[in-house]
């Protein structure tokens, strides 16, 4: 599992380096300001079904969550997806006692 976590970290760094600075898109308003490299952030979106949402009770308070490449660990619950650099990862949480 440590190897998978290390490979995931290397993949994320490689994606960030490859992405470079944000480019202005044709669908943006002409007067819209372009963000510099220091203003870039990672967008994480969550999408889960009702059964997962009920298990989490609408919050991840008291839980430790992380984005995994494919599968959650045996002690974790799959809550949704993380979208990092255009790549979808599995969002997994485990309860903290």
UniProtKB/Swiss-Prot annotation:
Tissue: Expressed in neutrophils (at protein level). Expressed in bone marrow.
Top-level taxonomic group: Eukaryota
GO molecular-function terms, A-Z: protein homodimerization activity
Keywords from the named record: Antibiotic, Antimicrobial, Cytoplasmic vesicle, Defensin, Disulfide bond, Fungicide, Secreted, Signal
Pro-sequence residue ranges: 20-63, 97
Effect recorded for residue 74 to A: Decreased antibacterial activity against E.coli. Weakens interaction with B.anthracis lef and with HIV-1 gp120
Post-translational modifications: The three-dimensional structure formed by the three intramolecular disulfide bridges is indispensable for effective bacterial killing.
Effect of residue 89 to A: Impaired homodimerization. Decreased antibacterial activity against S.aureus. Disrupts interaction with B.anthracis lef and with HIV-1 gp120
Protein name stated in the entry: Defensin alpha 4
Effect of residue 69 to A: Slight decrease in antibacterial activity against E.coli
This protein's record includes keyword Disulfide bond: yes
GO aspect biological process, one term: disruption of plasma membrane integrity in another organism
Gene Ontology CC terms, in alphabetical order: azurophil granule; extracellular region; extracellular space; Golgi lumen; specific granule lumen; transport vesicle
Function: Host-defense peptide that has antimicrobial activity against Gram-negative bacteria, and to a lesser extent also against Gram-positive bacteria and fungi. Exhibits antimicrobial activity against Gram-negative E.coli and E.aerogenes and Gram-positive S.faecalis, S.aureus and B.cereus and the yeast C.albicans (in vitro). Interacts with pathogenic surface proteins and toxins, such as HIV-1 surface protein gp120 and B.anthracis anthrax lethal factor lef. Protects blood cells against infection with HIV-1 (in vitro). Inhibits enzymatic activity of B.anthracis lef/anthrax lethal factor (in vitro).
InterPro entries referenced in this protein's UniProt entry, alphabetically: Alpha-defensin, Alpha-defensin_C, Alpha-defensin_N, Beta/alpha-defensin_C
Impact when changing residue 67 to A: Impairs bactericidal activity against E.coli and S.aureus
Effect of residue 95 to A: Slight decrease in antibacterial activity against E.coli and S.aureus
Assembly behavior: Homodimer; homodimerization seems to be required for killing S.aureus, but not E.coli. Interacts with CD4. Interacts with HIV-1 surface protein gp120; homodimerization is required for the interaction. Interacts with Bacillus anthracis lef; homodimerization is required for the interaction.
Signal sequence range: 1-19
Entry similarity comment: Belongs to the alpha-defensin family.
PANTHER family associated with the record: ALPHA-DEFENSIN 1 (PTHR11876), DEFENSIN ALPHA 4 (PTHR11876:SF23)
Effect of residue 73 to A: Decreased antibacterial activity against E.coli. Weakens interaction with B.anthracis lef and with HIV-1 gp120
Organism whose genome encodes this protein: Homo sapiens (Human)
